[in-house]
Amino acid sequence: MAPSRRAFLAAAAATMAAACSNQATRSDASASTTPTRPVPSTTPTTAGRVGAHATNVNGKPAKVVFAGPRTRRQVALTFHLSGDPALASRLLDTAAQAGVPISLFAVGRWLAEHPALVQRILADGHELDNHTWSHPMLGRLSGPAVAAEIRRCKAALTQATGSGGRYFRPSGMTRPTPLVLAEAGAAGYPLVVAYDVDPRDYTDPGADAVAARVTARLRPGSIVSLHTSHTGTITALAPVLTTARVRGLQPVRLHRLLDGRPSGP
């Protein structure tokens, strides 16, 4: 082969090799620098846009609180709102006569069935929060089922009041599980509210026993767990309020109690 032809072929081969090398380099650089769309780890939700107080738009797991600050002489009387509407009316009467606010964790199905009482609760200045749609044993449910219970009650609250409520309290458990905390946070509730005073009024021990059990543990920052569906509880409220007043403890709505740093049990 003539020298000139050998030189021509060598030059052509070198040019092609350089071109392939440059193209590969550009492809590698593109792969390493081009941003990719992240895949969401959970289904996107509208948490935070429905309900005036649904503020946890990041979907982080909720935190649990058992009591408010012990440095203030304030307590919160919280009621699980379900059952006989006549008993709920009696509770509202007692609270109105005493001039004290209460906080009610409503079962969503109950809200839908008793719109007139919901309006009275709001008119009387009480607080309404989320206590699931149908009051199941949440610890026995799957993640999607827990989420549905929380979100359906939130929707009922929003429909009835214009707000999804500030807080969530699970049904069927005294301490929320990690699953419940995760689903509550994803639904827009940064705090799950438990309690440090539980008279177990749902066992119907009688008004005297309920009052004695509450007052034995009542102290600054206490969150008391009670139920609207038990006659003894409604009757016990008046003596509980009397004892709180004697001790210089002021019943306030939950959001007022918890605007400081919450504490553990």
Task: Map each language-model feature to its residues.
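C-terminal domain-boundary segment and adjacent tail
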Residues: 35-37, 42-44, 48-49, 57-71, ...
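Active-site beta->alpha N-cap acidic-glycine motif
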Residues: 48-141, 145-149, 156
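Short charge-dense sequence patches
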Residues: 39-44, 64-69, 96-109, 160-168, ...
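Catalytic domains of cell-wall/extracellular-matrix polysaccharide-remodeling enzymes
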Residues: 90, 136-265
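Short, low-complexity, disordered segments immediately C-terminal to signal peptides
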Residues: 21-42
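N-terminal secretory signal peptides and thylakoid transit peptides that target proteins
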Residues: 1-15, 19
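Secondary-structure junction/capping motif
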Residues: 4, 25, 253-254
